[in-house]
From Swiss-Prot:
Its main location: nucleus. The gene is Hoxd3. Predominantly spinal cord and kidney. InterPro entries: HD, HD_metazoa, Homeobox_CS, Homeodomain-like_sf. It is found in: Nucleus. GO terms for biological process: anterior/posterior pattern specification; cartilage development; cell-matrix adhesion; DNA-templated transcription; embryonic skeletal system morphogenesis; glossopharyngeal nerve morphogenesis; Notch signaling pathway; positive regulation of gene expression. This is Homeobox protein Hox-D3. GO terms for cellular component: nucleus. CDD domains: homeodomain. It comes from Rattus norvegicus (Rat). Belongs to the Antp homeobox family.
């Protein structure tokens, strides 16, 4: 209610204020995986009482912060032939859904019946 019209015009949906517990969980997840598949995003949203959109935007913003920090440290541009640490999966961010060990599913049989 103390917001100005100019602020509301620039931020029509409002700004999300994350709790410290939510931030801890989001940062932990980011440490393991910078890109979330939809399934994991839904799990995180339910776990943290946030929307999928809030999770998605938080990860986008966090990746930009990470990229900026790496650039400031001079780490982002590695010598030719060496890839930077943790690049996004091939085929787009949603192409691969890496499950954490607690959520792992049993592997399918590798042989085909004759």
């Amino acid at each position: 209610t103390g917001r100005t019209r100019a602020h509301r015009a620039r931020h029509p949906r409002g700004c999300t204020a994350y709790t410290s517990a939510q931030l801890v969980e989001l940062e932990k997840e980011f440490h393991f995986n910078r890109y979330l598949c939809r399934r994991r995003r839904v799990e995180m949203a339910n776990l943290l009482n946030l929307t999928e959109r809030q999770i998605k935007i938080w990860f986008q913003n966090r990746r930009m912060k990470y990229k900026k920090d790496q650039k400031a440290k001079g780490i982002l541009h590695s010598p030719a032939g060496q890839s930077p640490e943790r690049t996004p999966p091939l085929g787009g961010a949603a192409a691969t859904c890496l499950l954490r060990p607690a959520a792992a599913v049993p592997a399918w049989p590798t042989t085909h019946p004759s």
